[in-house]
Design a protein with these regions (language model features):
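Alpha-helical segment of the N-proximal tetratricopeptide repeat
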Residues: 167-202, 210, 217, 312-318
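Structural marker of alpha-solenoid helical repeat scaffolds
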Residues: 201-202, 237-240, 274, 285, ...
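TPR/TPR-like (Sel1-like) alpha-helical repeat modules
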Residues: 268-274, 340, 344-375
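Residue-level recognition of tetratricopeptide repeat
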Residues: 170, 179, 204-206, 213-215, 241-244, 253, 278, 298, ...
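Short, conserved sequence motifs used for protein processing/export or organelle targeting and
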Residues: 1-180
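TPR alpha-solenoid repeat register
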Residues: 207-209, 247, 281, 292, ...
Length: 396
């Protein structure tokens, strides 16, 4: 798909993981089961986002006007993956192999939203067909199995087990696993790196390319040099070749962090200005990628700051570069008029260009659109109070 999964009405789409554990005919545990009313256990892992209003209440009935901040975002980006960790304790008397089955399930509307619909349709005199007023609502909307898999684990001292070979290539499974951990942020970067090293051992460019991303994300001592080396190994692949636009973007990020601003500017211009045959065929247009545009604008801004000298030639060159950076950030605002980074940099640029009035406009916009971390924290505290399960499941 060309968008996040799930997309659209994410306040009510219900996508969740159902996990069951068995040993022989004995059920040992489960997550993601439904109650008698058809609602899913709130301690389950949901593939959605959990939006809050200013009071920490969930946005759950199409009240988009009240959206304030996400508590978590579990949507899966295009071509990406997601990892979820489960822990369990086996009874001491288990002797048969452990069977674990996982299903990703989809239902168009969750029970919270359908209860709201049921209430409103009853008030309008048009109750939902089949529901007797005064009886508890049961969510009987159809459930689709998006994907499922199972694995069998041996028990110490028990019989050996053999799992059927997977149709999905091993490198792809390692790569997806690594991407899922990479997207979790700092907490699981080391595990992501190990997964990407396995991908590289299996002969795919994705391994060193994504390893470079993880190293840049962590950016400890010497890791930028290691990231640059990994990126060179990825670029050396030819069958298949690493996407040149991704290589250029990561090269720019690394060069920028290492102070090689001229090289970084060249890299970012490659991403936003070049159009290869493959990009045209696949309808890729990175000239509208405002993340890269902002990186380009910041790099030009930094290079302008490096121009020294008080003679007219130096002043003219510096002003020209500052104006060039302005134009790049204005391109970002044509795409995203509320882009905080663009407004912040434009405020700084116009200040240096002596345009105080324009600087003030963008300073005000930056203050208006930037995230209020204090208010966000209060909303999250309220949400955790009302939904204790979220303290664990929002970061699972």
């Amino acid at each position: 798909v060309g968008h996040h999964f799930t997309q659209g009405t994410t306040d009510s789409n219900e996508v969740w993981l159902e996990v069951t554990l068995k040993s022989g005919d004995r059920s040992l545990g489960a997550s993601g089961l439904m109650g008698p009313d058809g609602s899913v256990d709130e301690w389950s892992h949901f593939v959605n986002n959990f939006m809050l209003d200013k009071n920490g209440n969930r946005i759950d009935r199409r009240n988009a006007q009240d959206i304030f901040v996400p508590l978590y975002q579990h949507q899966i980006p295009p071509g990406s993956g997601q990892t979820v960790h489960y822990s369990f304790r086996l009874p001491d008397d288990v002797s048969e192999p452990l069977q674990v089955k996982v299903r990703l399930l989809y239902r168009k509307f969750d029970s919270t939203y359908m209860q709201y619909v049921d209430q409103k349709t009853a008030e309008l005199g048009r109750p939902i067909r089949g529901h007797q007023q005064g009886q508890p609502w049961r969510n009987e909307l159809p459930i689709l199995v998006v994907a499922e898999d199972s694995v069998v684990f041996p028990i110490a001292g028990g019989a050996a087990v053999e799992n059927a070979p997977r149709e999905i290539p091993e490198w792809q499974r390692w790569n997806d696993y690594g991407i899922g951990m990479l997207l979790k942020g700092k907490a699981e970067l080391r595990q992501a790196m190990e997964a990407f090293r396995r991908v590289e051992e299996l002969g795919r460019y994705d391994g060193p390319l994504n390893l470079a991303r993880a190293l840049v994300e962590e950016a400890g001592p010497g890791q930028l040099d290691e990231a640059a080396a990994a990126l060179q190994r990825a670029a050396a692949h030819s069958d298949p070749a690493a996407p040149p636009w991704t290589v250029a973007w990561l090269s720019g990020v690394i060069n920028r962090q290492q102070g090689r601003l001229a090289d970084a500017e060249t890299n970012f211009r490659q991403v936003t200005e070049e159009r290869t045959e493959e990009m045209v065929r696949r309808k890729f247009d990175f000239s509208r990628d405002y993340i890269v545009l902002n990186l380009l604008g910041q790099t030009i801004f930094d290079r302008a700051q490096q121009i020294r000298g008080s003679d007219d030639a130096a002043k003219e060159k510096r002003l020209a570069r500052l104006q060039e950076a302005v134009e790049v950030f204005r391109r970002t605002l044509q795409i995203d008029s509320e882009n905080v980074d663009a407004h912040y940099n434009l405020a700084q640029l116009y200040q240096q260009l002596g345009a105080a009035e324009q600087a003030a406009v963008h300073q005000q916009a930056h203050e208006k659109y930037k995230i209020d971390d204090t208010a966000r924290g209060l909303g999250v505290i309220d949400a955790h109070r009302d939904h204790p399960c979220l303290a664990r499941t929002c970061c699972a």
